[in-house]
């Protein structure tokens, strides 16, 4: 039975999950409709669609597992169920970070201004960059899956007294957690480097504009600032997401603590919910579609009120 605080936090987490699903579904649908209309899925559209779909899957996995764990934990008793959930979580979470990193690199290569020959070479060969990122993703899966298999096969993840518990030392749990998310950390570090380089590019561009004393509206600076805001928001929200997931992993060492588990879930769902909204507002095409839908909804509501009067 959930307490009052646990019920409130679970309601908040569920609302965040639903908003995340709606926002990411909107992003995926808009890009798919553009692909159907133009008979071509361009790089940014493919990345945004993949990011949205991976987040939708991630949210469904987390919220389904959470509700089962809280209300019907006995459903998780078969070993193959928890193994399947672990595999799905690894695939979707790492795909999600891969698409987000690819998006940041795509913007970086399109927007940043550097004269270094390595940057210019990468800018002309963006497909090679994406191939390298795919290699990082595959290597991450190669390291992650054996760790989960070993934990399950060694019976270190057991269903006891109506709850899942991990039977290992805290140091061993931390090591396994790091190995499982090694690819995520690598991609996240790449994103931090990209964000840092974009800030340097913005600073150099601003210094150049000041030296020229240009009074014209600088669109390049606006694009730089907008992109940096999106990247920084992703970094902050993803750190919160990792903290929330870590709290949920710790709950396996502290059984029967639903309050801590639901609190971690609430923090974890901030990322797919808020960042999808940020992407919609930052992308002019998505923003136009979003505003158009809101206007149509408002007009339909006004029409209903007019007919009722």
Swiss-Prot record:
Taxonomic superkingdom: Eukaryota
GO-annotated molecular function: bitter taste receptor activity; G protein-coupled receptor activity; taste receptor activity
Membrane topology, Extracellular segments: 1-7, 65-87, 149-182, 255-259
Keyword Transmembrane listed: yes
Spans traversing the lipid bilayer: 8-28, 44-64, 88-108, 128-148, 183-203, 234-254, 260-280
A Pfam family per the record: TAS2R
Subcellular location, record wording: Membrane
Cytoplasmic side: 29-43, 109-127, 204-233, 281-309
One cellular component term from this protein's GO annotations in UniProt: membrane
Glycosylation positions in this chain: 161
PANTHER family: TASTE RECEPTOR TYPE 2, TASTE RECEPTOR TYPE 2 MEMBER 114
Role: Putative taste receptor which may play a role in the perception of bitterness.
Similarity comment text for this entry: Belongs to the G-protein coupled receptor T2R family.
Record-given protein name: Taste receptor type 2 member 114
Gene: Tas2r114
